[in-house]
C-alpha cells in the first residue's frame, strides 16, 4: 500500500489552551467541517467526540490527548487534543514532544490565563511553531484587541492578526481576511457550513487598513526579497504575504492570530485554511536529534520515508477491546503491521501486532505507517511513554523525556480481598499510562500509596479505579510528600563488627556528608586510595547509604540533595563482606545526619488567585494564614491577580474555602514549584505526628 498523502501535505498539530477557552469545541468543529463527525458534539452536554473518557464527559474537561485524523483541501491533519488543567501538564508536555505545530486557543474574555502561560512555556521548550485562535467572540465582554496586547505583555510574543472580527458579543458576524482584504460572513441557518465573501463594511475600512499595514510589514520583515519589494513601494501579492507569514511562523518570530466562535460555528474554516497555509509539514521542522545507543554520540533523524524506521511512543492507553494501545509518532521510514521493532530505550525487541488509525474513539486497521504519521500500535509488551521504537539494524534513541516527581500522596485501601487483586493490576496499568503517577507501599503500615501532581490528578485516578476497573477502595487523607535534607557538612566514622566465634562481620568506613544545592539530588564519590577498602565492597557502601536515605532521621522521610565522600576505612581478610560494608555505610549515614543539622522540606506550590477587588484583602489574609508568601499583585480584565508561594500542606480544600470567601467569584490555579524548608514550629508538629 503506497502512501496516500505526500509528506509535505501532512500537518501534525495540537490544540492547546486553558480550561474553558473552548478547545474541545474547536476540535469538534474541525472534525465536523472536515466531514468526520455527522453530529456536532457539544462539551456542554458531554458528547464531544474528542472527550472520550467517562470522567472527561462528566467534568467537561479534557484529560487525555486523543488523536484524530481528518482531511482539508487535500491535506491530512492529525489532530491531538491536549488537556488544559494544571494537574495534567505532563500530558500536554508529551503531546508537545510529537507535534509539529500548535493552535493556542484563547477565550476572548478571559484572555491569557496562568495555564496558558504554562502551555506556552512548554511549546517554547520544544520549539513548536504556533498560531493563536481567539475563541468565544460571541460572549459578553469579548475583546480581540485586548487579547492581542495580553499576548504581547504576558507571553512576550509577537502576535500578527491575519483576520480581525466584524462586530463582537451578540453582533459578531464574521471576520475580515487581511490577506485577501475581504469580509467573510457566516450565515446561521447552515450551522456555519456556508459563508459569503463580501466587501469590507465601511465603518471597519480604517481599522482593516491599519491592521493590513501591520501584516504587510511583519510579512516583509521575514525575507530580504520581500523587504526590498515592500520598501520599493511595490504591491505584495497574496503569495508573497503568505510566504512571509509562513517563514515567520516557522521560525517563531511572529504568531499568526485569528478569531471566531467555535460554538456559534464561525471562523473554523478560516482557521483550517491557516493551519494548511502556515503551520509546518514534518519536513519543515528542525531535524530531530537522537543518540546512538552504541556510543552515545548524537545523530540527526530526518523526516523521510527513506531510511530505517524510527518513532517515539508518546502515550499509552488501555482499551477494553484491544488491550494496550501505544500511540507512536513515526519520524523516519515506514513500518508494516506484524513486523518486529527494537525498543532502543529498553534494549528489547517488540512485535507490532496491529496498527490502528484513531478517530477519537473509532478506529481503523491499517497495513503500514509512514514517516510523519501518528497511529496506535497494538501488542507491545514493554514499551512505556517516552521510549523510542526503531529498526534493530539502525538503532537510535530519540530524546528522553523527564517526568516530574509526585508532590502529593494518598493511601488507598481495597474493600475486599477480590478488590485487592484487581487493584494491583489496575494501578500498574494506570502507572504505565501516566508517568507522573507513582504507586508505592508504606513501609510501616503496608498501605498502598498513590502519588501524583495534585488533588484533581489523584481524584481522577481513584475515579478511574472505580469505573474502568470496578475496584471498590477506601481513600485516605491526602499526604504531602515531605523530604529531609542537611544544612552543615560533617565527617563520620562507623565500625560495624560482630566477632563472637565462627564467621564474623566486619566493615569500617569514614564518610564526609555535605549539603548540595536544592534539586541536585544524591552524589556518591569514592576517594579510597591504597586499597584500604577493597574495590568490590565500595558499591555496597553506596547501596547501604541509598537504602538508609529513604528514611531520614527526623521523621522518616526521604533525604535529598547531599553528597557523600567515602575517604577512609579498613577491612578484615576473613570477616569482611558486602553485607557488613552495606550496614556500616547505612549506620555511618544515619549518625552523620543526626549531627548535620537536618531540616524538613515541603513542596511549595506556585498559586495564582484571581478575585474581584473587594475580596482582595480577605484572600491575602487567608494566604498569609496558610504560611504563603505573596510575590506579586497585578490587574487583569478588572480583576486582581495575586501570585504567591504556598506550602501544599496548607492548600487542601482551598477551592471550597476560596469559593465561600468570594461567593464563588474567585478562581485559582496551582502547580508545584520547589521544595522549601519547613519552619521549626511546624516541623516539630509533623515529627511528633509521625512518631505518634
From Swiss-Prot:
Pfam families: EFG_C, EFG_III, EFG_IV, GTP_EFTU, GTP_EFTU_D2. It is found in: Cytoplasm. It comes from the Bacteria. One of its GO terms (biological process) is ribosome disassembly. Its main location: cytoplasm. The lineage of its organism: Bacteria, Pseudomonadati, Campylobacterota, Epsilonproteobacteria, Campylobacterales. GTP binds at residues 17-24, 81-85, 135-138. The gene is fusA. Keywords: Cytoplasm, Elongation factor, GTP-binding, Nucleotide-binding, Protein biosynthesis. This is Elongation factor G. PANTHER family: RIBOSOME-RELEASING FACTOR 2, MITOCHONDRIAL (PTHR43261:SF1), TRANSLATION ELONGATION FACTOR G-RELATED (PTHR43261). Belongs to the TRAFAC class translation factor GTPase superfamily. Classic translation factor GTPase family. EF-G/EF-2 subfamily. InterPro entries: EFG_II, EFG_III, EFG_III/V, EFG_IV, EFG_V, EFG_V-like, EFTu-like_2, G_TR_CS. The keyword Methyltransferase does not apply. Catalyzes the GTP-dependent ribosomal translocation step during translation elongation. During this step, the ribosome changes from the pre-translocational (PRE) to the post-translocational (POST) state as the newly formed A-site-bound peptidyl-tRNA and P-site-bound deacylated tRNA move to the P and E sites, respectively. Catalyzes the coordinated movement of the two tRNA molecules, the mRNA and conformational changes in the ribosome. GO terms for cellular component: cytoplasm.
